[in-house]
């Protein structure tokens, strides 16, 4: 079985859901609406949504509930990218093959668009129908979501990234940045899908956390490598000018070895889950993501 077909199904499903959510918003003639729509529907890999759907399949979660979780997570991811690109953070002119939101609509409206998308994500997670999900579980999901994207998660990761910019750091410090900045939202995505199954087990959650952190860290290193496009001259010329990344810190060869180690850890956790659950789709998804850097 090939995951590509299933990826297309997940990808199209979440894009349709996001389009429906955006199209239901008021003030559609406003710059704010256009900025939100532009950033949310301008492509992207939808990795987090795919992980949510695949995890949901593993634990037999109603797909309508997975739609809600996926939409909330992807809206927050879009918000984070808008803010990451701002001049005060990464000052990036391009995102997903297009000009960044603040370049197209201005810094003021980009800032507001990010804020509005975050609020919309919580609105969706709080109020949308999620069949089979009790209110107590919904509250647990909201608490997990807010923790993953706030002070104890994504925001502290971004702070650490900015704080260490242009400074020499070690691998341990870099992994901490990637853990908070990237892996924790991926962990949250998988946790929310698992919570929606209403079958909570600390042991299973621990295994899923190991899986998601391995995937999240590997994915971040892959992105760092893809950004450099294996251009050694670019690597050398930017060594003292760019943010800290694995390829800049330890080189491309060791970075690829690290990716393989992380995916090996991810597959190991799936083998443990395999004893009680059907993890075939999660395994196929992991293999699919792995191919991005080969």
Swiss-Prot record:
- Name the family the entry cites: Belongs to the FPP/GGPP synthase family.
The UniProt annotation places Mg(2+) 2 binding at: 84, 90
Q: Which cofactor does it need?
A: Mg(2+)
Q: Which residues bind (2E)-geranyl diphosphate?
A: 95, 181-182, 220
> What organism, scientifically named, is this protein from?
Buchnera aphidicola subsp. Schizaphis graminum (strain Sg)
- Name the Enzyme Commission number(s) assigned to this protein: 2.5.1.10
Q: Specify the protein name.
A: Farnesyl diphosphate synthase
Q: Which UniProt keywords apply?
A: Cytoplasm, Isoprene biosynthesis, Magnesium, Metal-binding, Transferase
Cellular location of this protein? Cytoplasm
Gene Ontology MF annotations: (2E,6E)-farnesyl diphosphate synthase activity; metal ion binding
How and how many cofactors are bound, per the record note?
A: Binds 2 Mg(2+) ions per subunit.
Q: A GO biological process this protein is involved in?
A: isoprenoid biosynthetic process
Which positions bind isopentenyl diphosphate? 45, 48, 77, 96
Q: Which residues cross the membrane?
A: none
According to its UniProt record, where is this protein mainly located?
Answer: cytoplasm
What gene does this protein come from? Answer: ispA
């Amino acid at each position: 079985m090939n995951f590509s077909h299933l990826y297309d199904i997940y990808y199209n499903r979440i894009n349709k859901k996001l389009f429906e959510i955006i199209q239901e918003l008021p003030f559609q003639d406003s710059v704010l609406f256009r900025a939100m729509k532009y950033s949310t529907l301008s492509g992207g890999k939808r990795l987090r949504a795919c992980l949510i759907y695949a995890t949901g399949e593993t634990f037999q979660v109603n797909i309508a509930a997975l739609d809600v979780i996926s939409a909330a997570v992807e809206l927050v991811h879009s918000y984070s990218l808008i803010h990451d690109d701002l001049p005060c953070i990464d000052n990036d002119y391009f995102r997903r093959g297009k000009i960044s939101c603040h370049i197209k609509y201005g810094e003021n409206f980009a800032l507001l668009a990010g804020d509005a998308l975050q609020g919309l994500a919580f609105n969706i997670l709080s109020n949308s129908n999620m069949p089979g999900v009790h209110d107590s579980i919904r509250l647990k999901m909201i608490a997990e979501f807010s923790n993953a994207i706030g002070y104890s998660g994504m925001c502290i990761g971004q702070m650490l990234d900015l704080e260490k910019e242009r400074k020499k750091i070690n691998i341990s410090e870099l992994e901490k940045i990637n853990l908070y900045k990237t892996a924790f939202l991926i962990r949250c995505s998988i946790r929310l899908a698992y919570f929606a199954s209403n079958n909570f087990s600390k042991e299973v959650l621990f295994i899923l956390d190991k899986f998601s952190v391995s995937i999240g860290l590997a994915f971040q290193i892959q992105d760092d490598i893809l950004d450099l496009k294996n251009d050694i001259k670019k690597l050398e010329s930017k060594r003292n000018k760019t943010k800290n990344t694995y390829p800049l810190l330890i080189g491309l060869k060791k970075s690829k070895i690290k990716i393989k180690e992380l995916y090996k850890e991810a597959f190991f956790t799936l083998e443990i889950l395999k004893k009680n659950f059907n993890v075939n789709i999660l395994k196929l998804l992991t293999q699919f993501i792995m191919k991005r850097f080969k």
